[in-house]
Regions:
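Glycine/alanine-rich phosphate-binding loops at beta-alpha junctions
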Residues: 2
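Structural alpha/beta surface segment adjacent to cysteine/selenocysteine redox centers
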Residues: 24-129
């Protein structure tokens, strides 16, 4: 069963993607100014999927063609956009941080709690990594974030170990791939899509056709 609705602004993202954090900030600026803002639906995309073993662990030896020049260019682009969008952000984090467990807990919170609790967890998870430089792959960090929005630690540990959540997360990732999503962030609305940390006026064009 598809989790995609053309009546919503669907966001394909991963917590470990810096451009997803920046794109989120730009999207929120658009939503604040829009006369009739659309509902937003966050959709998982596993940025590390091509490196992931069946057991969920990451193979850091997989060759991805990304060299020092590539990462230098990414850093330059992130520095430029964080200034342009006025986003507080650190780039002092490990490239080996993996968000898989955080995304499982995020899915659990969305299913078990109200939208406000999910949005708070979602926001604080992004900020934990990109503002505070915390390792959101660490179950203790995930539990701390969850407890700060009222989700008990025991539920977090259970969600991380939940095979059903694992299967649903994989299904949603495969669904994104089948739709042709190959990079993130991708923003989709009413059959149209835009990729990258686009500025607020491009959200207006995507959603309102102006």
């Amino acid at each position: 069963m598809s989790t995609i609705s053309e009546d919503e602004l669907t966001v394909f993202s991963d917590y470990v993607c810096p451009f997803c954090y920046l794109g989120k900030a730009a999207m929120e600026e658009y939503l604040e100014e829009a006369e009739d803002p659309p509902e937003v639906e966050w959709h998982v995309f596993d940025l590390r999927g091509y490196k992931r073993h069946p057991d969920g662990s990451i193979d850091h030896d997989v060759e991805d063609g990304k060299d020092d020049d590539y990462f230098a260019q990414v850093r330059d682009n992130v520095e430029r956009l964080k200034d342009e969008y006025d986003v507080e952000m650190t780039l002092d984090y490990s490239l080996e941080v993996d968000s898989w467990d955080a995304q499982k807990v995020s899915l659990y919170v969305k299913q078990a709690y109200d939208e406000e609790t999910f949005e708070e967890f979602h926001e604080r998870t992004f900020k934990a990594l990109w503002r505070d430089g915390r390792d959101i792959g660490d179950p203790d960090v995930i539990a701390d974030i969850a407890e700060s929005v009222g989700v008990p630690e025991e539920e977090v540990r259970d969600a991380i170990d939940d095979d059903g959540l694992e299967a649903e997360l994989k299904r949603r990732f495969e669904e994104a791939q089948e739709m042709g999503v190959s990079g993130i962030p991708t923003f989709a609305y009413d059959g149209h899509a835009a990729r990258g940390a686009i500025p607020p006026h491009q959200f207006e064009r995507l959603v309102e056709g102006t």
